[in-house]
């Protein structure tokens, strides 16, 4: 089996909008999803950025990072692997690779929720 090669790219506003509409609304419950306008405004102000991870031209994953200018800590705000790529270990590989892409960050803050506390059983996987 050929090893997968991924390309990391910071998404432009139009790309992020598509990811939000097509992917994020599926991947996160409405109660946890910030409005698109808030995310776009944060990115435009330099307070956040979103990585798209691609295999060739195909989006595999996205990681929305929050880091105000001058801050040495990045926060992973949203992270998802697209359904066709889940349960393959890609998520763990991408999290391990994340520090190399967060230039200038001395730490990365990751919030995780306990699956047993999920309101929706489908979201607890």
Task: Name every feature range the model reports, one short phrase each.
Residues 1-38, 54:
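Short amphipathic alpha-helix that is part of the acyltransferase structural core
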Residues 41-52, 61:
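A short helix-loop-beta-strand connector motif used in the catalytic cores of GNAT acetyltransferases and
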Residues 52, 57-67, 73-80:
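Conserved beta-strand in the GNAT
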Residues 81, 87-101:
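Conserved acetyl-CoA-binding loop-helix of GNAT-fold acetyltransferases
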Residues 102-121:
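Conserved GNAT acetyl-CoA-binding A-motif
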């Amino acid at each position: 089996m050929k090893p997968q090669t991924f390309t990391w790219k910071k998404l432009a506003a139009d790309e992020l909008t598509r990811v939000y509409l097509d992917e994020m609304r599926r991947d996160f419950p409405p109660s946890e999803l910030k409005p698109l306008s808030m995310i776009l405004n944060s990115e435009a102000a330099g307070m956040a950025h979103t990585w798209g991870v691609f295999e060739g031209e195909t989006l595999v994953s996205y990681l929305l990072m929050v880091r105000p200018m001058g801050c040495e800590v990045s926060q992973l705000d949203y992270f998802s692997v697209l359904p066709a790529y889940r349960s393959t270990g890609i998520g763990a590989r991408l999290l391990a690779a994340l520090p190399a892409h967060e230039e200038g960050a001395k730490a990365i803050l990751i919030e995780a929720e306990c699956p047993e506390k999920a309101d929706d059983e489908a979201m607890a996987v």
